[in-house]
């Protein structure tokens, strides 16, 4: 019979006498055991800007929050940094106003207020951090303080948006179609509105209006867009559009303000075919307009800034900015921006910042 004790079965034979490591390079009689030494080394956990730049946010004081992640090997983890606008082109670990190392990836960062940052982690948690306080430290007011956290989503948060009309209210969504509306006005984060099955397909987009906290819009991969009413006692939504032909597959959403594009009754949806669709919430179940932005790649993100609509694509990564009021005339185009484009933000009326993998940050000047 075979020996019952694993220590006898798997122990190193007495006859195993390999030569020194330097002589093992061309030796075929003994296995190279250098991998054991490699696995025994401690991982380098020192703070650093990782290669994958995944999310960026900016507040009204032009202070940037940047999430970078290590996505190699078995252990994925990330770091969060804060920089002033004047530091944008020479970012480093030492020059950061604040930094935070996380055990998991930092997927999304969004400013709720100028000194209040929402952070979505890869382990499904949503955290709220205070980033600036002269009361806690008058000499170094930039310091992180955890205000609250919650694990209200069964899968990692993929969508996070703050209501401009009330920055202390935000909505989060995950790919499994779970939605949460958060009240940040108290001493902790409180979910005031929750839906566990907002869509029958994968949730891919979420957008909030500029002048209201009563509603928001979501879209999914199956070509469905829904308008949600937060005032209802139970989760309540209206179907804005449902693709009966099952041809459309939405990827992103943006909601214009009253002074932007065609007014605050219009919602813009990107799809996997590189097209941007316009929906009028006053005329549900009908697309008001469809424009092709990319002949290759899908629309990964839509950002509105005054009369301009910026569309970002992946596969390949590209950026296009159109003047919607001039018939969607393209006024700026940039090809092969990153190996993978992950996030973007407008810093002023004519400057768009994109981040991603490969080429980490690109500044787009719109003339």
Curated annotation (Swiss-Prot):
The keyword ATP-binding does not apply. Keywords: Cytoplasm, Developmental protein, Differentiation, Oogenesis, Repeat, WD repeat. It is found in: Cytoplasm. GO terms for biological process: cellularization; embryonic pattern specification; oocyte axis specification; pole plasm assembly. The keyword Repeat applies. It comes from the Eukaryota. GO terms for cellular component: cytoplasm; methylosome; P granule; pole plasm. SUPFAM superfamilies: WD40 repeat-like. In oocytes, localizes to pole plasm and nuage (at protein level). Expressed stronger in the germline than in somatic cells. In the germarium it sometimes concentrates in perinuclear aggregates that disappear by stage 2 of oogenesis. At later stages, it is uniformly distributed in the nurse cells and oocyte, as well as in young embryos, with no particular enrichment at the posterior or inside the pole cells (at protein level). It holds the Pfam family WD40. Residues 309-367 are annotated as: Interaction with csul. WD repeats lie at residues 101-139, 152-192, 198-238. Interacts with csul and tud. Involved in specific localization of cytoplasmic proteins during the formation of pole plasm. Required for synthesis and/or stability of oskar protein (osk) and localization of tudor (tud) in both the nuage and posterior pole of the oocyte. Required for normal posterior localization of osk in later stages of oogenesis and for posterior localization of the vasa (vas) protein during the entire process of pole plasm assembly. May act by regulating the complex that contains the arginine N-methyltransferase csul. This is Protein valois. It comes from Drosophila melanogaster (Fruit fly). The gene is vls.
């Amino acid at each position: 019979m075979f020996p019952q004790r694993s220590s006898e079965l798997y122990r190193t034979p007495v006859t195993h006498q390999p030569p020194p490591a330097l002589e093992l390079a061309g030796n075929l009689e003994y296995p190279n055991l250098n991998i054991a030494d490699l696995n025994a080394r401690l991982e380098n956990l020192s703070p650093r800007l990782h290669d994958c730049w995944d999310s960026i946010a900016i507040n009204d004081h032009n202070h940037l929050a940047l999430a970078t992640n290590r996505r190699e090997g078995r252990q994925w983890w990330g770091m969060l940094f804060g920089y002033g606008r004047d530091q944008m082109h020479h970012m480093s670990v030492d020059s950061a106003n604040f930094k935070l190392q996380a055990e998991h990836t930092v997927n999304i960062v969004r400013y709720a207020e100028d000194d209040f940052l929402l952070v979505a982690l890869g382990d499904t948690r949503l955290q709220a951090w205070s980033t600036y306080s002269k009361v806690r430290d008058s000499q170094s007011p930039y310091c992180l303080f955890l205000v609250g956290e919650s694990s209200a989503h069964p899968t990692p948060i993929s969508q996070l948006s703050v209501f401009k009309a009330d920055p202390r209210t935000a909505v989060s969504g995950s790919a499994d179609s779970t939605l949460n509306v958060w009240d940040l006005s108290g001493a902790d984060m409180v979910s005031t509105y929750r839906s566990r099955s907002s869509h029958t397909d994968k949730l891919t987009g979420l957008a909030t209006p500029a002048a209201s906290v009563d509603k928001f819009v979501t879209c999914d991969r199956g070509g469905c867009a829904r308008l949600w009413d937060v005032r209802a006692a139970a989760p309540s939504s209206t179907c804005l559009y449902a693709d009966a032909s099952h041809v459309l597959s939405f990827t992103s959403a943006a909601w214009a303000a009253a002074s932007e594009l065609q007014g605050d009754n219009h919602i813009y949806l990107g799809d996997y075919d590189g097209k941007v669709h316009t929906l009028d919430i006053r005329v549900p179940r009908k697309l008001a307009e469809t424009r092709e932005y990319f002949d290759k790649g899908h629309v990964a993100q839509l950002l509105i800034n005054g009369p301009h609509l910026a569309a970002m694509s992946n596969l390949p990564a590209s950026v296009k900015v159109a003047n919607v009021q001039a018939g969607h005339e393209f006024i700026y185009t940039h090809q092969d921006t990153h190996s993978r484009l992950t996030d973007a933000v407008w810093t002023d009326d004519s400057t768009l910042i994109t981040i991603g993998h490969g080429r980490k940050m690109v500044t787009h000047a719109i003339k």
